């Protein structure tokens, strides 16, 4: 009995989803295989780590020190974060603290610049 590939495909085309599911299970049992999708391989060692560092897309703006002009720094923090006066003051008083987390590089750099111009010491992480 010769089996024609086209006849097999035509037979598959006429099957319902339930029948196809039963067929897959039967093939798995008969040949000892699994129809589960394979996981993608993990990134390599040091080369993968260096590439990940270069491709960083989210940054944290960290206020490391309030500086002498605390009022200006509080105003800058309020502008950047949209916090209320008390929350912004608490954040500035509690330095070093994250001002913003997970922001794009351009936004993070602008926030650091604004804080530095206000008299604070800030950094990008």
Curated annotation (Swiss-Prot):
GO biological process: translation
Classification via CDD domains: Ribosomal_L7_L12
SUPFAM superfamilies named among the record's database cross-references: ClpS-like, Ribosomal protein L7/12, oligomerisation (N-terminal) domain
GO molecular function: mRNA binding; structural constituent of ribosome
Keywords, comma-separated and alphabetical: Ribonucleoprotein, Ribosomal protein
One GO CC annotation: cytosolic large ribosomal subunit
Chloroplast listed as a keyword: no
Role description: Forms part of the ribosomal stalk which helps the ribosome interact with GTP-bound translation factors. Is thus essential for accurate translation.
UniProt cross-references to NCBIfam families, sorted A to Z: L12
Subunit structure: Homodimer. Part of the ribosomal stalk of the 50S ribosomal subunit. Forms a multimeric L10(L12)X complex, where L10 forms an elongated spine to which 2 to 4 L12 dimers bind in a sequential fashion. Binds GTP-bound translation factors.
Family according to the record: Belongs to the bacterial ribosomal protein bL12 family.
HAMAP family reported in the protein's UniProt record: Ribosomal_bL12 (MF_00368)
This protein's name: Large ribosomal subunit protein bL12
């Amino acid at each position: 009995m010769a089996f024609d590939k086209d006849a097999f495909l035509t037979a598959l085309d006429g099957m319902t989803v339930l029948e196809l599911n039963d067929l897959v299970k039967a093939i798995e049992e008969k040949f000892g295989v699994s129809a589960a999708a394979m996981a993608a391989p993990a990134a390599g060692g040091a080369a993968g780590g260096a590439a990940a560092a270069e491709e960083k897309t989210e940054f944290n703006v960290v206020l490391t020190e309030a500086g002498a002009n605390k009022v200006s720094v509080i105003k800058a923090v309020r502008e950047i974060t949209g916090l209320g006066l008390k929350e912004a003051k608490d954040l500035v008083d509690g330095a070093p603290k994250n001002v913003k987390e997970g922001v794009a590089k351009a936004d993070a750099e602008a926030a650091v610049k604004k804080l530095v111009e206000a008299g604070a010491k800030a950094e990008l992480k």
